[in-house]
Amino acid sequence: RDRVASRGLGDLYKRQIQQLEERKKIDLERKKKRDDRGSKKFAKDIKLTTDIIFITKEREVPAVLSNLDPILNDEGFYGIQLGVEDNLTTGRFLGHDYKVKMIQVSLKEDLEEEFKKLIKSGYTYFVADLNSGELSKLSNLKESKNILLINIRSKEDSLRNEFCKTNLIHVAPSYTMLSDALTQYLVKKKWKKWFLVIGPEKEDKAYADALKKSAKKFNIKIKEERVWDFASDLRRTAQKEIPIFTKGVNYDIMVVADEKGEFGEYLSYRTWDPRLIVGSQGLKPTNWHRTHEQWGATQMQNRFRRKSGRWMTPVDYSAWVAVRVIGEAVSRVQDNKLQSIKEYLFSEGFGIGAYKGVKVSFRNWNGQLRQPILLAAPRSMVSVSPQEGYLHPTSELDTLGVDEPESSCIF
């Protein structure tokens, strides 16, 4: 019976793969026909070509806890491609074309020198899959004065505040936006007593700082704050160490800051008291998730899966938004000059649909994209913030993250 069941599952998996390949083939044929029609009709009418650089840095592969999640070396790539396709849908009718060049700087190469070469070659628009330190260095280069960097990965709050730059805008949400989104939901559920567990990494501390600010902002009590500093292999010791680590605290919910996933997954079902896990594990605030299906998101999920063969990640989504932002601005102002594009991006008239029920737009005081934040469990969508009842004189989306009066950014 086991062999029959196993064979049945194998056949089902093969059929699913076959169906996926067939749909992908149909999509490619349809795209080729559209491209052929478009090139025949509009090739002679191209009046404006916008060049975009997608720049990323090769990373050393980190140690993983399991092999369940694949290590991706193409994050952002397929999001960029979908963004270009969507831009061309309107662009061809307007005589606009978009070309993207993918640049991955190797471990041995100097990122700053490679970036300077690209600027010298005449490129203006850069979609950047880089960390906070790299973004800060590139935006501070004297050669970077007349370019636009679009951040699709880093959540670091300082890049939106004291270290903000007029040549750097952010599609990726900040730590404060994510923590505010989560906190609003926890307040709604009346889970107001937190046990905060913080990892040892720099990113963990940055996320924890944002969580503490959100707790203060929404009148949450952090009953206990502990740093996870165990070096043992949790696959063998979790059942012994975690109950002792979490014992003796009166709390409603455990909030975890473990950005690299070094220990957070082991906390569930092992705490001394039966409590839910939220934060970087468990119920997680994010700008995109594979379970998101509302507001036409299913269409985007299916398009991405057929193109890439995998689920869309937050970085993939941010890459798509970044390219769409440029395309929308070029279409509206009928120009691709930097000054014209930036003026429109920060104007009240700018906004694009992004499969989240409302148009997303940029905050003109720090260059951050205001957007709804999804609250997702590993296999289900739970809620979307801002939560009902949180009001703002300009936009309810500005209840998430640093508002203009609080901002230390000076553009």
What are these regions (language model features)?
Residues 2-13:
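Short, small-residue-biased leader/transition segments that mark boundaries at the very start
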Residues 11-411:
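Extracytosolic ligand-binding ectodomains
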